[in-house]
């Protein structure tokens, strides 16, 4: 009996035309049947947003051997939900988000539409991976990341991931990658996030900007340290965000009324 090819579902938050997504497709060709359901335009920072106030549509934009590409009017999470409900012929072997234009290390994982894709796949019990490059430009060079993407994806297809666990993989913007580091998420936060401007017709408006404040720049087990030193940062990420260590302490609080 002929073995089925792996079924790979891709999406992103930069849109179906983004270079990162198309480089991801190129890097994964030959590994299985690839189905893409991506937003019809940029949806960066969408996180886990879903569309509930109006209908969502999708359209086929490309089809060739072992590759079918659709664009969707919804969010990145909508794309995964809709693809699983409509266009995939069976349960995917892996869900992949990316390659994102810009890193999703540290707290960025909470804002990221790319990781929204990954978390949605993980919630559905499917092994899921997010790939991101530390370069926001539309013409970013993803070539050095592609061999690692292929290897990591092969390993996930071979071993699988435990229920509730997904991978957040970030690449430094360099042609000379030093290798892979298994990392934890860096502790930090965005500061000075808003640029205020005055409108010529009166009033004010704001652009989201900001800078990242790394609370632990010397932490060699963190993703930011790895990226800053030329390593691919692989961070296992979990769906269950319960702070188990706090549960017993809370039981001692007087919370009843």
From Swiss-Prot:
| Free-text comment on the cofactor | Binds 1 divalent metal cation per subunit.
Q: Which cofactor does it need?
A: a divalent metal cation
Residues that bind a divalent metal cation:
13-14, 44, 100
- Where does the signal sequence lie? none
EC number, as in UniProt = 3.1.3.5
Q: Which UniProt keywords apply?
A: Cytoplasm, Hydrolase, Metal-binding, Nucleotide-binding
This entry carries the following GO cellular component terms, namely: cytoplasm
**InterPro entries hit by this protein:** SurE, SurE-like_Pase/nucleotidase, SurE-like_sf
Return the Pfam families for the record. SurE (PF01975)
Name a GO molecular-function annotation: metal ion binding
Q: What is its biological role? A: Nucleotidase that shows phosphatase activity on nucleoside 5'-monophosphates.
The record's comment on protein family reads: Belongs to the SurE nucleotidase family.
What is the recorded name of this protein? 5'-nucleotidase SurE
Q: Which organism is it from?
A: Phocaeicola vulgatus (strain ATCC 8482 / DSM 1447 / JCM 5826 / CCUG 4940 / NBRC 14291 / NCTC 11154)
């Amino acid at each position: 009996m002929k073995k089925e090819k792996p079924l790979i579902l891709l999406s992103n938050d930069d849109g179906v035309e983004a270079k990162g997504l198309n480089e991801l497709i190129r890097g994964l060709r030959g590994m299985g049947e690839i189905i893409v359901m991506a937003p019809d335009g940029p949806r960066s920072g969408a996180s886990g947003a879903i569309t509930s106030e109006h209908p969502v549509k999708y359209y086929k934009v490309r089809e060739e051997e072992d590759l079918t590409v659709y664009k969707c009017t919804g969010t990145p999470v909508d794309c995964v939900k809709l693809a699983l409900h409509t266009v995939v012929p069976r349960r995917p072997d892996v869900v992949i988000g990316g390659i994102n234009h810009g890193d999703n290390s540290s707290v960025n994982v909470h804002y990221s539409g790319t990781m929204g894709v990954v978390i949605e796949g993980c919630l559905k019990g499917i092994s899921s991976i997010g790939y991101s490059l530390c370069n926001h430009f539309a013409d970013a060079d993803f070539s050095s990341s592609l061999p690692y993407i292929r290897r990591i994806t092969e390993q996930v297809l071979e071993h699988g991931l435990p229920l509730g666990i997904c991978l957040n993989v970030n690449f430094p913007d360099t042609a000379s990658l030093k290798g892979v580091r298994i990392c934890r998420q860096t502790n930090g936060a965005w500061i000075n996030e808003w640029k205020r401007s005055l409108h010529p017709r009166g009033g004010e408006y704001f652009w989201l900007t900001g800078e990242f404040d790394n609370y632990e720049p010397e932490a060699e087990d963190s993703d930011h340290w790895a990226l800053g030193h030329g390593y691919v940062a692989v961070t296992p990420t979990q769906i269950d965000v319960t702070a188990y260590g706090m549960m017993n302490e809370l039981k001692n609080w007087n919370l009843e009324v």
